Amino acid sequence: MGCIMSQTDDAASRSKKIDRLLKEDQENANKTVKLLLLGAGESGKSTILKQMRIIHDVGYTKDERRVFRSVVFGNIILSLNAIIAAMEQLKIEYEKEEHRADARKVLAFGATGEEDEIPDELAALMKSVWSDEGIQKAVARSREYQLNDSAEYYLSQLDRICEADYIPTQDDVLRTRIKTTGIVETQFIFKDRLFVVFDVGGQRSERKKWIHCFEDVTALIFCVAMSEYDMVLMEDRKTNRMRESLKVFDSICNSKWFVETSIILFLNKKDLFEEKIKKSPLTYCFPEYTGHDNFDDGSAFIQKQFEIVNKRQGGQKEIYTQFTCATDTNNIRFVFDAVTDIVIRDNLRTCGLY
């Protein structure tokens, strides 16, 4: 009889332990927020991920920033090469013949995309070429060819960047351009929750890999480069970038994978958009647009174009839209704080705790 009682007590004890562990696992799961960061290529996703590391983690140490030297150098050289090539393509004349000769020498140096250093001779040539008025005209027409957003930022600071002891700043790191391939995962603690953020390659060739991130995602952040309404894709040089973003957002927003998932729309690069719309009309992408060529009218129109693709409107599925500047740490800090409250609230509602 005593043995039977002992076995019964052991079974009850094991059952309670299992129940407690299951409860703890559920509580931990409820405190984990998984964010999927999506968007077309060059929408600013990776920059936003870097901001999250700066804001919510330790940022980048001096040694880590030093590693980005080669990336900055590569971005600068490739950008200047693209501008020089565009001079001929756009039939823009150099202000001075000596600058044309220096441009040829810059091209002769070649570029791998990640240079270990910028030789003094190349630095002097680059500064000479960058000072040319014709080069500045080519930069102003960058929508007509492929040029990194960071090009002007870096090239205007060649004196600092070409110093022998140069170490990239946090801002320099934020503006580096490295194509995201595959899936990059970042984790940090914020508001007593573990955030796991997945950045997925944005170019067309990478999208087939997104499916592996879909399970159990708490929320989705979709990034759109507002300023690219008058530009074409790097992949095919024909498709309008804004139209491509709309197409991808439609497929994501209405996907069976995201029926219960909160969707946050980041209309990014608002600073570039505000300047560009003054000189490049929004009708380039949207012929039906009748508003003024200013930020307020243009941004409201773009927001509407994305929100109307939602086939689960009327309370079934809400899209939370934020206007962002991924290179502005204070802006991303403010926006992410607001977004986090939305995500936590929706997550609690899904768990039946709100």
From Swiss-Prot:
Attached lipid, kind S-palmitoyl cysteine, located at C3
Q: Where is this region: G4 motif?
A: 264-271
One Pfam family named in its UniProt record: G-alpha
UniProt domain G-alpha: residue ranges: 31-354
Q: Does the keyword GTP-binding apply?
A: yes
Give the span(s) annotated as G5 motif.
324-329
Q: Residue ranges of region G2 motif?
A: 172-180
Gene Ontology terms, cellular component aspect?
Answer: cytoplasm; heterotrimeric G-protein complex
Q: Which residues cross the membrane?
A: none
Q: Show the segment(s) annotated as G3 motif.
A: 195-204
Q: Name one GO molecular function term.
A: metal ion binding
| Keywords for the protein's UniProt record, in alphabetical order | Cell cycle, Cell division, GTP-binding, Lipoprotein, Magnesium, Metal-binding, Mitosis, Myristate, Nucleotide-binding, Palmitate, Transducer
- From what superkingdom does this record's organism come? Eukaryota
Q: Where is this region: G1 motif?
A: 34-47
Q: Name the Gene Ontology biological process terms.
A: adenylate cyclase-modulating G protein-coupled receptor signaling pathway; cell division
* Residues that coordinate or bind Mg(2+): S46, T180
- Purpose of the protein: Guanine nucleotide-binding proteins (G proteins) are involved as modulators or transducers in various transmembrane signaling systems. In the 1-cell embryo, probably together with goa-1, controls nuclear rotation and spindle elongation during mitosis. During the first embryonic cell divisons, plays a role in gpr-1/2 cortical localization and in the proper orientation of EMS blastomere mitotic spindle.
**Quaternary assembly:** G proteins are composed of 3 units; alpha, beta and gamma. The alpha chain contains the guanine nucleotide binding site.
Q: Provide the protein name.
A: Guanine nucleotide-binding protein alpha-16 subunit
Name the species this protein comes from.
Caenorhabditis briggsae
